C-alpha cells in the first residue's frame, strides 16, 4: 500500500483562513496585500485578471455589482471597527497606584490594562517572578481586573509596562503613577 502524506496548507496571517477563503472574511483587502507580499505565485493564481474573469463569467452584471457593494460595505465596517478599537486603546491610560499598608509597607495596584488584550494572570505571574514579590489579580470597585503587587516597585512596574506597550506599538498610551496615603486617624480625646 502507498503511504498517504498530509497536505501542507498555507494559512493567511491576517484572518487565519486559507488564502482561497480570505474573500469571505471581513479583512479581505489586508489579506490580499499580505498574500501579494508573502505568496506572489498563489496571489497570481487566485487574483490575476484571468482568474477573476473566469470566476465572474458566470455571474450577471447586476449580481456582480451587488456583491462588490456588499463587500465594500463590510470592509468599511471592519476598518471603522479597527479604527475605533485603536482610538479606544490610545485614549485609555494605565494607572499605577502606590498604596500604603503600614508605616513602611506598600502595595501597588495596576489598573487599565484590560483594554490592551493582555492576559492579566500571566502579567501578574511575570511581576511576581521579575520583582520577587507576591502579585495577584483582583476585581476593583468598578468590577474591572487590576493587578496587586506587594512591595514598592511602582517605578520598575511603570518601566516594564511602558516597554510592553511599546512592543504593541502603543507609545502614546499614558502610564500614570499615583501615590495614595492612608488617612491618619485623629488621636482619641
Curated annotation (Swiss-Prot):
Any one Gene Ontology cellular component term annotated for this protein: ribosome
Domain SUI1: 94-165
Record flagged with keyword Cytoplasm: yes
CDD domains the record matches: DENR_C (cd11607)
A single GO BP: formation of translation preinitiation complex
Subcellular locations according to the entry: Cytoplasm
Assembly information from the UniProt record: Interacts with the 40S ribosomal subunit.
Domain notes: The SUI1 domain may be involved in RNA binding.
Protein name stated in the entry: Translation machinery-associated protein 22
Amino acid at each position: 500500500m502507498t503511504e498517504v502524506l498530509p497536505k501542507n496548507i498555507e494559512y493567511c496571517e491576517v484572518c487565519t483562513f486559507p488564502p482561497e477563503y480570505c474573500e469571505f472574511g471581513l479583512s479581505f483587502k489586508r489579506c490580499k496585500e499580505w498574500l501579494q507580499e508573502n505568496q506572489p505565485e498563489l496571489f497570481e493564481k487566485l487574483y490575476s485578471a484571468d482568474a477573476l474573469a473566469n470566476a465572474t463569467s458566470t455571474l450577471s452584471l447586476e449580481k456582480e455589482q451587488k456583491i462588490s457593494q456588499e463587500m465594500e460595505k463590510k470592509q468599511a465596517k471592519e476598518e471603522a471597527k479597527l479604527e475605533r478599537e485603536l482610538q479606544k486603546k490610545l485614549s485609555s491610560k494605565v494607572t499605577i497606584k502606590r498604596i500604603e499598608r503600614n508605616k513602611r509597607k506598600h502595595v501597588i495596584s495596576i489598573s487599565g490594562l484590560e483594554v490592551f488584550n493582555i492576559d492579566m494572570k500571566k502579567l501578574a505571574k511575570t511581576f511576581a517572578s521579575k520583582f520577587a514579590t507576591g502579585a495577584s489579580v483582583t476585581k476593583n470597585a468598578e468590577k474591572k481586573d487590576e493587578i496587586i503587587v506587594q512591595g514598592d516597585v511602582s517605578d520598575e512596574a511603570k518601566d516594564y509596562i511602558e516597554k510592553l506597550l511599546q512592543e504593541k506599538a502603543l507609545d502614546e498610551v499614558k502610564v500614570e503613577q499615583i501615590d495614595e496615603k492612608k488617612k491618619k486617624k485623629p488621636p482619641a480625646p
